[in-house]
Amino acid sequence: GISQTPLGAVTGEENADGDDQKALDVLADQLIEQALAKTSLFAYLSEEREQPVPLSASGQLICACDPLDGSSNIDTNLTIGTIFSLYPAPDHKTETNLLCPGRDQIAAGFFAYGPQTALLLTYGNGVFAFCFDGAQYRLMDWQVRIPGQTSEFAINAANHRHWSARTTSYIDQLLAGKQGERGRNFNMRWAGSLVADCWRILRRGGIFLYPEDSRRGFESGRLRLVYEANPISFLVEQAGGLATDGERDILDIQPTELHQRVPLIFGSANEVEFYKSD
């Protein structure tokens, strides 16, 4: 089981996106496939797999999943998670037809494995938070709404030299604080785990930026539209925030391939709008 796995060990293999796989990445993917095989889902789309995994030919739903987000944090014992979403299966089931815009999602969420094991979930009618008590998931007393205003931002500042002029200008304004044109101080938070950064923003507001940049392989962003950006954006919008690639709402983008990458900026609505207008 997971508790016996060399958690941070690298397998020597790469996943469908060319990222190094860790032992727990592979195990998480296998466990999820085994669990979904017992359901009536039509197909399993995994960030770890090149192709869809067929399940039940009569199934009416598709599950898209990042089995283990933030796996670079495994050996440092920081928060990691599982991101997922559900789509209706198309009438004529081909691989091309499995590519649906995020607006078609009927449910999405993520599990966070940190100081507490928790679940954030939306069915398109708000966001609900659950905490695992060792036996079952219990609904938390938390009205999940992202504050419209924020004084926190999340970005990997080590990539500053690769950013576009717009991203550089925006972050420089935040760093200027009270002495700058924004007239107030901002704090930077960066967990290196999408689920951890998203949880924090859902809790207390903020803006998350993983923009495109000039590095090879990053020109169109780095996060996966189907497995990461769409489910996170569905949660964010349902909590009153916004999610964009800088030009379009993430949920309006029509995927052209399973492992398509996009820039992702999400969080407090006012701050996301400010970034888009800069």
Identify the function of each model-found stretch:
Residues 2-4, 13-15, 23-278:
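IMPase-like, lithium-sensitive Mg2+-dependent phosphomonoesterase catalytic core
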